[in-house]
Curated annotation (Swiss-Prot):
Glycans are attached at residue 289. InterPro entries: Cyt_P450 (IPR001128), Cyt_P450_E_grp-IV (IPR002403), Cyt_P450_sf (IPR036396). Pathway: Mycotoxin biosynthesis. Its EC number is 1.-.-.-. Belongs to the cytochrome P450 family. This is Cytochrome P450 monooxygenase ataF. Heme binds at residue 434. Keywords: Glycoprotein, Iron, Membrane, Metal-binding, Monooxygenase, Oxidoreductase, Transmembrane, Transmembrane helix. The chain crosses the membrane at residues 12-32. The gene is ataF. CDD domains: CYP503A1-like. Pfam families: p450. It is found in: Membrane. It is a single-pass membrane protein.
Length: 489
């Protein structure tokens, strides 16, 4: 045996010993943590196969009490509806959404959950106040984005909505975030779509590994290496945009507003790394959820075609041939209702309002239970969306359910898609309700309006509505199912 092979064997034995020690230590910590959670005076449900069925069974037994849900790589307390008012205004030192996002979405690689007051302020104030501004960029981009994915087929042509809507969401959001020409650059578009996919794929792997071992395993995952490369690429591509000379004439072309708002939030101007961080945070928040929601909307139009003509009629009566703008978008009540109903039955998650308890004394609930510090919590959304006391015949898709409710005196401004409350937490609720929900809702309306006015849509023959897929608590559309589109005559 050669000296080199002996050295390699010794090195392997040394590394194996370290890995074994770390694994034993990590497993021990994981078991101690699990035992502490099991000692809570809460009913515990373990997900073996069907997470949806498990949540429904747990809710049926404990409709007004919290319960522990145990899944691969995660245990959390699922709160009842009363938990919404308990946590909706609590600050980060009581329950933390940032810590949750950092843990779940691999913050050390994705920036999710990292401290970024400039990003928070731009999203919560600039974006919310200036939704009409980004609306103009959506309108300017929608035809290019839709035709780039679907073309203008004069015969019925099959498309996979999830793949197409990912690109449409990237183009539309990119136009608002960074503007032309970068937003249409193929490398940039592909990277933004891949970024959201890699975050999800990396988590699906890492969730099966004890948390103490994840820093040692993560750097070797191809998805994590890809995330690092995308961070570097984003910095490189955004650096030229920090040069004031490149801002000339940008005001004449809709788009790039988010980038400007990010820059204005830094007194000394952002570094390329800071700007890349803000851009990637906005990218993940928008593209992942938007592409899923747009896919569901296309499936629902194809599955429930009786809604298509009433929606087209509303668009024709309200728009009168003009593009969507800040005035007429408020009058599209049936379109808004259709989008909210689609989200009610196809929400982003089975539970929402994610937090980690950070108060050392724990979180006291109306039920008398105390959730300990360090415990992950969420509020059940699935059972809220299907509550027959809120929504008659809740499993039935009624695209105009909410527009009819708004016709009742006193309800004019209620039941809108972007409205949150104790009856709708699909965008969260309270202090940390999704700050981009009006941005997202406007983008969905612009895309849906363009599709309805320019395309016919249907399901392939003998195909039922595509089923949702569950990954943990996340709900995603079927990536393989097709819809048929053709350009209207």
């Amino acid at each position: 045996m050669s000296l080199a092979s002996l050295d390699l064997n010794a090195l392997w034995l040394e590394h194996s010993a370290v890995i074994a020690t770390l694994f034993a230590f990590g497993t021990a910590l994981f078991l101690v943590s699990r035992s502490q959670k099991q000692s809570l005076n809460l009913p515990r449900f373990e997900v073996t196969n069907d997470v949806l069925k498990t949540i429904e069974e747990a809710h049926a037994q404990y409709p007004d009490d919290p319960f522990i849900l145990s899944m691969v790589g995660m245990e959390l307390a699922i709160l009842p509806r009363s938990g919404i008012d308990v946590i909706k205004t609590l600050p980060e030192d009581q329950v933390s959404i940032k810590r949750h996002h950092h843990d779940v979405f691999l913050g050390e690689y994705t920036y999710m959950g990292t401290k970024s007051p400039e990003f928070d302020e731009a999203m919560r104030y600039d974006l919310t106040r200036n939704t009409p501004t980004v609306l103009a960029s959506f309108v300017a981009e929608v035809q290019y984005a839709v035709e780039d994915s679907f073309g203008r087929p004069d015969q019925w042509t099959a498309f996979q909505p999830r793949a197409c809507m990912s690109k449409i969401a990237s183009l539309m959001s990119g136009r608002a975030f960074v503007g032309l020409p970068l937003s249409r650059d193929n490398t940039w578009v592909d990277a933004t779509v891949r970024y959201t996919q890699d975050v999800t794929r990396a988590w699906l792997v890492l969730r099966t590994i004890p948390w103490v071992l994840r820093p040692f395993v993560a750097p070797f995952l191809p998805q994590v290496r890809s995330l690092k490369n995308q961070r570097r690429m984003t910095e490189e591509r955004l650096t030229p945009l920090l040069d004031p000379s490149n801002a000339k004439n940008r005001d004449e072309i809709p788009g790039g507003d988010m980038l400007r708002w990010f820059r204005q939030r830094y007194p000394q101007g952002p570094t390329p790394k800071q700007l890349a961080r803000d851009q990637l945070l906005a990218t993940f928040a928008s593209i992942y959820n938007l592409s899923n929601a747009l896919s569901y909307l296309l499936f629902d139009l194809a599955t429930y075609p009786e809604h298509i003509e009433p929606l087209r009629q509303e668009l024709q009566e309200v728009l009168k041939g003009e593009p969507v703008n800040k005035e007429n978008i408020q009058k599209l009540k049936k379109l808004d209702s259709f989008i909210r109903e689609s989200q009610r039955l196809s929400p982003p998650s089975l539970a929402n309002m994610p937090r980690i308890v950070t108060n050392p004394r724990g979180l006291k609930l109306p039920s008398g239970h105390t959730i300990p510090c360090g415990m992950r919590i969420m509020v059940r959304a699935h059972t809220l969306n299907l509550d027959p006391n809120l929504w008659p015949n809740p499993t039935r898709f009624d695209g105009f359910r909410f527009s009819k409710l708004r016709e009742i005196p006193g309800n004019t401004f209620k039941y809108q898609h972007a409205t949150t409350g104790t009856d709708n937490i699909n965008f969260g609720h309270g202090l940390w309700a999704c700050p981009g929900r009006h941005f997202a809702s406007s983008q969905m309306k612009v895309v849906l309006a363009h599709l309805l006015l320019n395309y016919d849509i249907k399901l392939p023959n003998r195909m039922e509505k595509p089923q949702q897929q569950h990954f943990g608590l996340a709900i995603v559309p079927d990536t393989e199912q097709m819809v048929l589109l053709k350009i209207r005559g």
